[in-house]
A protein has these predicted regions:
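Short loop/turn motifs at secondary-structure junctions
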Residues: 3, 43-44, 125-127, 150
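Metal-dependent polysaccharide deacetylase catalytic core of the NodB/CE4 family, i.e.
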Residues: 52-137, 199, 208-210
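Alpha-helical packing segments of well-folded alpha/beta enzyme cores
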Residues: 31-35, 112-116, 120, 142
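Hydrophobic faces of well-ordered beta-strands that scaffold small-molecule active sites
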Residues: 6-10, 46-48, 75-79, 129-131, ...
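Active-site-adjacent pocket scaffolds in enzyme catalytic domains
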Residues: 133-212
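A structural signal for the main folded, soluble domain(s) of proteins
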Residues: 26-27, 34, 38-40, 69-74, ...
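Active-site beta->alpha N-cap acidic-glycine motif
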Residues: 1-70
C-alpha cells in the first residue's frame, strides 16, 4: 500500500498582513531559514508560495535562490490583489477592504497575474509551476489564466468551506464557496472548477481540520 503524499506549502507574505497596515514590513524573511532547515532535516521540500512584498525583499530573494539552487524546495506564486501591481483601486480603500482578485475585471485580473508571474520568473530564473490564490478566492477565469501561463498545480481549494461570508469589496459577494468541491487531487474542468476534467491543471485541495 502506497503511503499518502505529504506536501508542505507556505504562504510567503509580509508581517501581520491582516492588520490593515498601509506599509507592509517583511521582517519575517529573516527567520524562514530555520523552517527550511527543519524541513530538510526530515526530507521535505517545501513550496514557498510567494507574494509581491516578499518577491522584492532582498533577504527572501537570497534565501529562496539558495533553496532552488540546492534543489531543496520550490518557489510558487501567491497573489493578494490589493497590494500587487499594477495598482487599481476597486473599493476606494483597498488596503482597508482587501478585495479578492476574482472581484476585479478580467483585464485587471490578467494584468496582476501576468505581473506576478513574470516578476517571480525573472527574479528566481525558474518557471512558476505552483500557485495558491490570495484569500482562497478562485474561479474559472483565474484557473484558465494559470493554464495559459503554464502553471501545473493549484492549491487554492478548501473543501467543504464556504468563504461567502468573508467579505472583500463591500459591494461584492464574498469569497469562493468550496462546500461541494472534491477533497482529493483532480485535474480541473475549465468550465466548472468544482469538477474533475481534462485540463493540465492539477488541483491539490488543502487539508482541513473541520470544526464540529
Amino acid at each position: 500500500m502506497k503511503k499518502p503524499a505529504f506536501i508542505i506549502t507556505i504562504d510567503t507574505e509580509g508581517d501581520n498582513l491582516w492588520q490593515n497596515h498601509r506599509v507592509i514590513k517583511t521582517e519575517n524573511a529573516r527567520y524562514l531559514a530555520r523552517f527550511q532547515a527543519l524541513c530538510e532535516r526530515f526530507g521535505f521540500k517545501p513550496v514557498w508560495l510567494t507574494n509581491y512584498e516578499m518577491a522584492i525583499e532582498p533577504v527572501f530573494i537570497e534565501f529562496a535562490k539558495d533553496v532552488i539552487a540546492r534543489g531543496q524546495g520550490e518557489v510558487g506564486m501567491h497573489l493578494h490583489a490589493w497590494n500587487s501591481p499594477p495598482e487599481h483601486d476597486l473599493t476606494g480603500d483597498d488596503w482597508r477592504w482587501q478585495p479578492y482578485l476574482i472581484e476585479f475585471s478580467d483585464e485587471i485580473m490578467r494584468e496582476k497575474v501576468l505581473f506576478m508571474t513574470h516578476l517571480l520568473e525573472e527574479t528566481f530564473q525558474t518557471k512558476m509551476l505552483s500557485h495558491r490564490a490570495g484569500r482562497w478566492a478562485f474561479d474559472r477565469r483565474y484557473a484558465n489564466l494559470l493554464i495559459e501561463l503554464g502553471y501545473q498545480v493549484d492549491c487554492s481549494v478548501t473543501p467543504r468551506v464556504n468563504w461567502r461570508n468573508a467579505k472583500g469589496a463591500p459591494q461584492g459577494h464574498g469569497g469562493t464557496n468550496y462546500q461541494h468541491f472534491p477533497d482529493h487531487a483532480y485535474f480541473i474542468d475549465t468550465e466548472d472548477i468544482s469538477r474533475p476534467g481534462k485540463s493540465p491543471l492539477l488541483e491539490v485541495p488543502m487539508s482541513i481540520q473541520y470544526k464540529h
